[in-house]
Regions:
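Short, Lys/Arg-enriched N-terminal segments with co-localized hydrophobic residues
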Residues: 3-11
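A short, Lys/Arg-enriched amphipathic alpha-helix followed by its capping loop at the start of a domain
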Residues: 11-14, 32-38
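Hydrophobic faces of well-ordered beta-strands that scaffold small-molecule active sites
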Residues: 12-18, 41-43, 77-82, 112-114, ...
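Short polar catalytic/cofactor-binding loops
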Residues: 18-24
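Active-site acidic/histidine proton-transfer and metal-coordination neighborhood
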Residues: 28, 34-35, 63-76, 86-177, ...
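Glycine-rich, proline-tolerant flexible connector loops at the mouths of alpha/beta enzymes
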Residues: 42-67, 118-121
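Short, glycine/acidic-enriched loop or turn micro-motifs at the edges of active sites
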Residues: 45-47, 155, 181, 208-211
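Gly/Pro-rich active-site loop or hairpin
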Residues: 52-57, 91, 160, 164, ...
Length: 230
């Protein structure tokens, strides 16, 4: 479940990530959300691929065509989820990230998710993350982009005190708070984490898990509300 914090509205926006239904086409994902009374979708994958820029180009031809399709839908898109990582952001990775911008700008998608990357949250990783954020500030100032980069607490930002160190250097950094990861992977109390991130959070990811090793992880995901996350 995805919760988008709508600072312009009276309520939170409820959505899901298409990562859980990656083979669906855009029309099918929008219909699924509508069928379950959700407000929006967060697009990570469509048609079996996470290369959304190529998917949109093949299916719609132009950003304007995608925009018309989304304008006709009662379900909106709250974010495009990219693969860029603040730590380890190569020139090629940045170029791939920028391919999302024409589609986001035309369709009025406000948020572009990136990962934090890294692992330890040490001074070197924080400095590299801040450098990538500065690159984005300079790029968006030059190009006049309206979409916002939101950083998911996925990797080094699950470490205790890492969020504070990042925000000290980038107090305007927009966050996607993965409530599960800072708790399960970082051992942090969600109440305390919220105190840190509430002023910067644009989206929340809500997941649940149990302490049973899975195929790839030391825990297993379960439907929200049926696991150990409280």
């Amino acid at each position: 479940m995805v919760i988008a914090v709508d600072n312009d509205g009276p309520r939170m926006t409820l959505a899901f990530s298409t990562l859980g239904c990656a083979d669906l086409e855009l029309s099918e994902a929008l219909a699924l959300a509508a069928r379950h009374g959700l407000d929006a979708i967060e697009i990570r994958a469509l048609g079996g691929t996470i290369d959304l820029a190529t998917y949109f180009s093949e299916r719609f031809g132009s950003p304007a065509s995608l925009a018309r399709t989304l304008e006709a839908s009662a379900v909106r898109v709250c974010a495009f989820n990219t693969s860029l990582r603040l730590v380890g952001a190569t020139s090629q990775a940045k170029e791939e990230f920028l391919r999302y911008l024409p589609w986001a700008e035309a369709a009025g998608v406000k948020s572009l998710r990136v990962f934090d990357g890294g692992n330890s949250g040490d001074a070197g990783e924080v400095a590299e993350a801040l450098s990538t954020l500065q690159w984005w500030r300079e790029t968006t100032d030059r190009e006049g982009f309206s979409a916002e980069m939101i950083v998911e607490t996925h990797d080094f930002l699950v470490q205790p005190d890492a969020i504070a160190r990042l925000l000290e250097g980038a107090p305007d950094c927009a966050l996607l708070w993965d409530t599960h990861h800072t708790w399960r992977k970082g051992g942090q109390d969600p109440v305390e984490t919220w105190k840190q991130v509430r002023g910067n959070t644009r989206h929340l990811h809500v997941k649940d898990s149990i302490s049973k090793p899975g195929p790839k992880l030391p825990y297993s995901y379960v439907p929200p509300g049926s696991g150990e996350f409280q």
